[in-house]
């Protein structure tokens, strides 16, 4: 067992500070974050060029150490040695909260294993910021980070998670979002989602609707900018609601465009919308 008193204990080593940075709007940088970055001995940055611009804006002269997923394994022992010697470090990511979809967690774990105090500062976090304005249930929720890129792995992921009642959050590339939503539709049915782009920036946008509605919108309005996908959790004994606005043939065609064979696409959409597969087959082939 370990008990950490972050500010009251007499320190025999330095402290590791986890400092959030703005996710798009520099006005979201906190006074405490600026003060901490000025006071520590070194700043561990995911991208020193990107963080350098932030430091320059707030007149912070603290030296940076490059720390990212490709060098974390070799850097962590040296960083722990610095902390043990009494130096304090701040870890930042390119945007948002450290340790969320970056290598910060491994550094935190190593510090805790060495009885080094770890102090997290509150601040910007894309997932929570988007969730509370999404209109979907804020709790319970689960954040998964980035999705698998390959269609087969992604569908397997969705099949495993489709029955979860929690609101789900994902990061996704704007270039893959249509394929991702198509795969999700096949596994989750046409449930409610919120697609958020350019959070806290000038072109911030929330697209709220069913998966099929968002897909139709994206056909006419290509997505640009960083985005986050929030999905309603599964409802007990829920059934997909089929309305006149849902074009099942178009959904089958989108499945085919995503790489599915026609019969498999028909089977997927029929299952998602709980319609007769043979009837959808005849409708698709205009029999």
From Swiss-Prot:
Enzyme class: transferase
Domain of life: Bacteria
EC number in record: 2.1.1.198
UniProt keyword annotation of Glycoprotein present: no
Subcellular location: Cytoplasm
Membrane keyword on record: no
Alphabetized UniProt keyword annotations: Cytoplasm, Methyltransferase, rRNA processing, S-adenosyl-L-methionine, Transferase
Pfam families in UniProt: TP_methylase
Spans traversing the lipid bilayer: none
Reactions catalysed according to its record: cytidine(1402) in 16S rRNA + S-adenosyl-L-methionine = 2'-O-methylcytidine(1402) in 16S rRNA + S-adenosyl-L-homocysteine + H(+)
One Gene Ontology term of the molecular function aspect: rRNA (cytosine-2'-O-)-methyltransferase activity
Annotated InterPro entries: 4pyrrol_Mease, 4pyrrol_Methylase_sf, 4pyrrole_Mease_sub1, 4pyrrole_Mease_sub2, rRNA_ssu_MeTfrase_I, SAM_MeTrfase_RsmI_CS
GO cellular component: cytoplasm
Family: Belongs to the methyltransferase superfamily. RsmI family.
Function recorded in the entry: Catalyzes the 2'-O-methylation of the ribose of cytidine 1402 (C1402) in 16S rRNA.
Entry protein name: Ribosomal RNA small subunit methyltransferase I
Organism whose genome encodes this protein: Streptococcus pyogenes serotype M1
Origin organism lineage: Bacteria, Bacillati, Bacillota, Bacilli, Lactobacillales
Gene designation: rsmI
